[in-house]
Amino acid sequence: MARRDFIKQTAAAAAATVAGVPLTGYTQNIVTESEAAKLKWSKAPCRFCGTGCGVNVAVKDNQVVATHGDFNAEVNKGLNCVKGYFLSKIMYGSDRLTQPLLRMKDGKYAKDGEFAPVSWDQAFDVMAEQFKRVLKDKGPEAVGMFGSGQWTVWEGYAALKLMKAGFRTNNLDPNARHCMASAAVGFMRTFGADEPMGCYDDIENADAFVLWGSNMAEMHPILWTRVTDRRLSAPATKVAVLSTFEHRSYELADLTLTFEPQSDLAILNYIANHIIRTKRVNRDFVDKHTVFREGNADIGYGLRPEHPLQQAARNAGDAGGSKPITFDDFARFVSKYDLEYTAKLSGVPKNRLEELAELYADPKVRVTSFWTMGFNQHTRGVWCNNMVYNIHLLTGKISTPGNSPFSLTGQPSACGTAREVGTFSHRLPADLVVTNPEHRRHAEEIWKLPDGTIPSKVGAHAVLQNRMLKDGKINAYWVMVNNNMQAAANLMNEGLPGYRNPENFIVVSDAYPTVTTLSADLILPAAMWVEKEGAYGNAERRTQFWHQLVDAPGQARSDLWQLVEFSKRFKVEEVWPADLLAKKPEYRGKTLYDVLFANGKVNQFPNTELDAEYANQEAQAFGFYLQKGLFEEYAEFGRGHGHDLAPFDVYHKARGLRWPVVDGKETLWRYREGSDPYVKPGTGFQFYGNPDGKAVIFALPYEPPPEAPDKEYPFWLSTGRVLEHWHSGSMTRRVPELYKAFPEAVCFMHPDDAQALGVRRGVEVEVVSRRGRMRTRVETRGRDKPPRGLVFVPWFDAGQLINKVTLDATDPISFQTDFKKCAVKIVKV
């Protein structure tokens, strides 16, 4: 056996062993027998998290039969986690959706009917009829779409054009609202531009890692292997982990801090105070490159307006507001957060708080901060993001190798599609926003649309969409590549009622039956991953392409095909007002397809430019290289504006490039002279997203959560993920090995709490909140070890819907839901 083959097998076996997954002889040997098996290998990014690992995909007889880590991929260097190891199986569940299904009774669509197979023409006929009815009766604000950070770049871009330019509604939002909205808004508030300034190379250059609400060992395991390698190969390196409960990342940590939920706000301010008090502020950096502002406090919790907490909030109507202050004002503001106060509020021992603060304060220690949902799924998630930037800016530990505040991403293209393309309800591509008239005009110019096409009003975000569906304000709704009925908080009160509202027509495009598809009126079968040509953008700004490698089963079609084909059903005069059409009379009689996708730009690349080795069903269907046309039009937004993308064809050859890509060269560290081509010579650093080129340090307080344990509901509930499953489990639970490794969700609980309740490991209990209840089983010995008074329940299990229980409170600036904190009681069944 060759050394490389041995390494491949060892890496795969290690990944599987983490989850206790058995390896069959066939899957062990298939990567070493490629010649004998006549396999065709091609590159692709992994389908799961936002790490963006490269994989090699083997195809035989129009089926994916094996995958392994791509040794030429800079991100993972040949390694895959256990989910990545079983990628070859995610497309072949026995219940794969292969034809459109419509609720019918007596041969016609009926809201209370049963699902029956229909053709694509029938499906689109009914769907178009319903959308036209709603547009005519109520206008574009009654139409909505909920998309995904799993959309390819061009799928998201096509959806953006169809909704915001075609139907003229900003009621488009991605499921990234649930995971990355606070990170995105945090970047915009501090730097005036979204996405990290650093890259994964920071890992090999850092002297210390601080994890804030991030279980990287399970959620970003390949990056964790790089952190582990750095920690073990450079013994002076330190790892600190902060969380509300103990998890697998604690095993590597030199310093652990288990804190009271919500008190991370106080800890962040304590660190800033410590840096100032011990005179370790990098005054030269701060004076040249930062300004100070105090953010509005008492901003509410994103609940319905009539909720008492919203009524009582002083600044609920201006949650993102702020005013200028000085450095001295900031120093006075954080001085309250001294060691005594912070230790008491957080429950963290004083010596551990001091040790953590010293990692940041010591000018000789290069620090990389990582965070994910613990920060972002937080009613003050934007503040958390702003406050960790405060620490890095005060010390000047930013935009240099090893010094990086780094928001990790949960979905494969939450960055590349949701954020960069701009599929949020307030955004357009390349950090443009719908509220800015110049931004709208720029988009309309690129899209060859009349002035005033794109509406200026911010659309409904994810949580508001559910509320508007329930209230009958959104009536035609399309859901793609997500399982929001399982994923959204308070689902029985705010999710399901809207989907089953008789006034509403709900379309769900997916590859498998889910809780969401079963709540729909029309189900459209979707192609997955390498069944289509695609592009993702990962957490380090790396854009990666792949070819279509196999055909989708049955009548399943890509989301891109669905979006573009559906646009043919609408004449421009059916969806645009007469005054708008009068500005472009040549569009009269044309379809949205003609105006948006056959506009002379998107359709400019002929099919002769396709790689003859690979199929492309969309190009075959529409007669031109659709993906290339969409990408090149989209790239116009960013080129010359700090979001430069390379030419389309380059990405099919490369293992991804980190933008901005200028003159063929990618950018590793943004905002630093010598690394970022947009930084002017002589400035050193330039945070050019803001007009003055300076980053903002925000004074922000600790504020309590909207709900906390009390006598009736004495436990904190936190939800999250586990290594073996991804999000709602609709893919991973159909992989037998992953299902066997972790078949059902459980309620992780401290043994003393279990004893006090009179329950043992494996006993069935109900988790009950003010909103609902669900059944699960107690686990007191597992990998996750909550402190007394807190329970943790993963949300991957469709048979145990923990979001019946959770609270739909959000950060009032980003509108991202806090899935980490609500009050529950545990009742023995």
UniProtKB/Swiss-Prot annotation:
<dbReference type="GO" id="GO:0051539">
    <property type="term" value="F:4 iron, 4 sulfur cluster binding"/>
</dbReference>
<comment type="function">
    <text>Catalytic subunit of the periplasmic nitrate reductase complex NapAB. Receives electrons from NapB and catalyzes the reduction of nitrate to nitrite.</text>
</comment>
<feature type="binding site">
    <location>
        <position position="81"/>
    </location>
    <ligand>
        <name>[4Fe-4S] cluster</name>
    </ligand>
</feature>
<keyword id="KW-0534">Nitrate assimilation</keyword>
<keyword id="KW-0411">Iron-sulfur</keyword>
<protein>
    <recommendedName>
        <fullName>Periplasmic nitrate reductase</fullName>
        <ecNumber>1.9.6.1</ecNumber>
    </recommendedName>
</protein>
<dbReference type="GO" id="GO:0042597">
    <property type="term" value="C:periplasmic space"/>
</dbReference>
<dbReference type="GO" id="GO:0009055">
    <property type="term" value="F:electron transfer activity"/>
</dbReference>
<dbReference type="InterPro" id="IPR009010">
    <property type="entry name" value="Asp_de-COase-like_dom_sf"/>
</dbReference>
<dbReference type="InterPro" id="IPR006657">
    <property type="entry name" value="MoPterin_dinucl-bd_dom"/>
</dbReference>
<keyword id="KW-0004">4Fe-4S</keyword>
<feature type="binding site">
    <location>
        <position position="46"/>
    </location>
    <ligand>
        <name>[4Fe-4S] cluster</name>
    </ligand>
</feature>
<dbReference type="GO" id="GO:0006777">
    <property type="term" value="P:Mo-molybdopterin cofactor biosynthetic process"/>
</dbReference>
<feature type="binding site">
    <location>
        <position position="559"/>
    </location>
    <ligand>
        <name>Mo-bis(molybdopterin guanine dinucleotide)</name>
    </ligand>
</feature>
<dbReference type="GO" id="GO:0050140">
    <property type="term" value="F:nitrate reductase (cytochrome) activity"/>
</dbReference>
<keyword id="KW-0732">Signal</keyword>
<dbReference type="InterPro" id="IPR010051">
    <property type="entry name" value="Periplasm_NO3_reductase_lsu"/>
</dbReference>
<feature type="binding site">
    <location>
        <position position="53"/>
    </location>
    <ligand>
        <name>[4Fe-4S] cluster</name>
    </ligand>
</feature>
<dbReference type="GO" id="GO:0016020">
    <property type="term" value="C:membrane"/>
</dbReference>
<keyword id="KW-0574">Periplasm</keyword>
<dbReference type="Pfam" id="PF04879">
    <property type="entry name" value="Molybdop_Fe4S4"/>
</dbReference>
<feature type="binding site">
    <location>
        <position position="49"/>
    </location>
    <ligand>
        <name>[4Fe-4S] cluster</name>
    </ligand>
</feature>
<feature type="domain" description="4Fe-4S Mo/W bis-MGD-type">
    <location>
        <begin position="39"/>
        <end position="95"/>
    </location>
</feature>
<comment type="similarity">
    <text>Belongs to the prokaryotic molybdopterin-containing oxidoreductase family. NasA/NapA/NarB subfamily.</text>
</comment>
<feature type="binding site">
    <location>
        <begin position="243"/>
        <end position="247"/>
    </location>
    <ligand>
        <name>Mo-bis(molybdopterin guanine dinucleotide)</name>
    </ligand>
</feature>
<dbReference type="InterPro" id="IPR050123">
    <property type="entry name" value="Prok_molybdopt-oxidoreductase"/>
</dbReference>
<dbReference type="InterPro" id="IPR006963">
    <property type="entry name" value="Mopterin_OxRdtase_4Fe-4S_dom"/>
</dbReference>
<feature type="binding site">
    <location>
        <position position="373"/>
    </location>
    <ligand>
        <name>Mo-bis(molybdopterin guanine dinucleotide)</name>
    </ligand>
</feature>
<feature type="binding site">
    <location>
        <begin position="509"/>
        <end position="510"/>
    </location>
    <ligand>
        <name>Mo-bis(molybdopterin guanine dinucleotide)</name>
    </ligand>
</feature>
<dbReference type="GO" id="GO:0042128">
    <property type="term" value="P:nitrate assimilation"/>
</dbReference>
<feature type="signal peptide" description="Tat-type signal">
    <location>
        <begin position="1"/>
        <end position="36"/>
    </location>
</feature>
<feature type="binding site">
    <location>
        <position position="803"/>
    </location>
    <ligand>
        <name>Mo-bis(molybdopterin guanine dinucleotide)</name>
    </ligand>
</feature>
<feature type="binding site">
    <location>
        <begin position="262"/>
        <end position="264"/>
    </location>
    <ligand>
        <name>Mo-bis(molybdopterin guanine dinucleotide)</name>
    </ligand>
</feature>
<keyword id="KW-0479">Metal-binding</keyword>
<dbReference type="GO" id="GO:0043546">
    <property type="term" value="F:molybdopterin cofactor binding"/>
</dbReference>
<feature type="binding site">
    <location>
        <position position="820"/>
    </location>
    <ligand>
        <name>Mo-bis(molybdopterin guanine dinucleotide)</name>
    </ligand>
</feature>
<dbReference type="InterPro" id="IPR027467">
    <property type="entry name" value="MopterinOxRdtase_cofactor_BS"/>
</dbReference>
<keyword id="KW-0813">Transport</keyword>
<feature type="binding site">
    <location>
        <position position="179"/>
    </location>
    <ligand>
        <name>Mo-bis(molybdopterin guanine dinucleotide)</name>
    </ligand>
</feature>
<keyword id="KW-0408">Iron</keyword>
<feature type="binding site">
    <location>
        <position position="150"/>
    </location>
    <ligand>
        <name>Mo-bis(molybdopterin guanine dinucleotide)</name>
    </ligand>
</feature>
<dbReference type="Pfam" id="PF01568">
    <property type="entry name" value="Molydop_binding"/>
</dbReference>
